[in-house]
Every structure is written in C-alpha cells, then in structure tokens.
Amino acid sequence: MTATANDKPQTCAQIIRARRANVETAADAVSLAARTAVLLLFAYLFFSRVFLLAQAPGNDMFPAVKDGDLLIGYRLQRDFSKNDVVVYTAEGERRTGRVLGRASDVITIDGSGTLLVNGTAQAGEIMYPTYPEEGLGYPYTVPDGCVFILGDYRTQSQDSRDFGAIALDDVEAKVITVIRRRSL
C-alpha cells in the first residue's frame, strides 16, 4: 500500500487487521449465502414432498371448499379413509373431491339421486342429489389401487362419475387445512 501526502503511514499490525476484517466479512457473506441456500432447499423439499400448497381449482367441493381457497395438504398419506377431502389430478387438471369408495367397494347411484356404498345410503352433510353420468355402469366396483371420488357440489362437479375410479398415484394429497380466500 502506498502512502499519499494526506495518509498517515500504517503499521504492519494495522494493515493485517484491515485485511483480516475484509476476509472475515467475505467469510460471513459466504456463510450467510450457504445458510440461505440450505433453508431454501429445505423449504422446497418440505413443500414439494411433504406438504401441498394449492389453490382450490373450482367449486367442486362447494360449500366446504370454495373456488380460490388455499388448501394445505399432506402428501405422505397413501391410505385414504372414506370422507377424506383430497386433491387429485384427472384428465390433466387438478381437482378436489371427497373419497367415497376404496378398493373393492361397490358404488351404486340410481336415477332418484341416491348414492349407496356397499348397500348403505350415504347422506351426511351433502345437500345436492347424486345422479349418475353416462359412461359408467352401476353397480360399480372400485378396482384395486384406486378410490372413488365425488365432489360435494354434485350437480356441478366432474368427478369419478365422469372419469371412473381415480388411481392412488393420481391423488396428490389429503387436505388437512382450508384457508378461506376472503380471510386473507
């Protein structure tokens, strides 16, 4: 380092301290960048492999889930129970629905709007009648490795009545929380 007329000559100790401070600042920056990268990688893996964040793609589950609501789902569960609300893919589109039948269950939908699973009428909180769609014959036995999914808004939703049973591989996650869009 060269001294100018206005600079005081520096001692060796001062020069060493200044260079050490520069090295420590650079090391701190690298450490911060590495920690940030690890945190971002963890967040990516957490939300791409363990949990699902998705916006409800329509009113298939109205009134329980409305179009635009934020859904938080658990991806690691593969054994779905009846009445679990799930996010699944059918015909290339993400959809939501309620699991009503599992492998070997017999689903019957008659012309009067009655839904039977293994001979038992399904009522619950559903206020819309369930009518069969063309193409799927009833009684229908759910194949192994599949689930039968219906939307709660039965008169407007596309679901297993249209697509048949949904393969477990096409079910992305079980919905564990719904955050209403209007509350954000």
PLM regions: where:
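Conserved S/T- and glycine-rich ATP-binding loop of Class I adenylate-forming
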Residues: 68, 101, 149-151
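Generic structural signal for buried aliphatic residues
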Residues: 71, 86, 107, 147-148, ...
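Protein maturation boundaries and topogenic segments
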Residues: 1-95, 164-184
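Beta-strand-rich cores of mature extracytoplasmic or soluble domains
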Residues: 135-184
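Extracytoplasmic/periplasmic/luminal assembly and interaction segments
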Residues: 78-117, 122
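PP2C/PPM family metal-dependent serine/threonine protein phosphatase catalytic domain
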Residues: 117-134
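Short secondary-structure boundary/capping segments
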Residues: 62-63, 77, 99, 132, ...
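Short, surface-exposed linear segments at secondary-structure transitions and domain or protein termini
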Residues: 105-110, 130-137
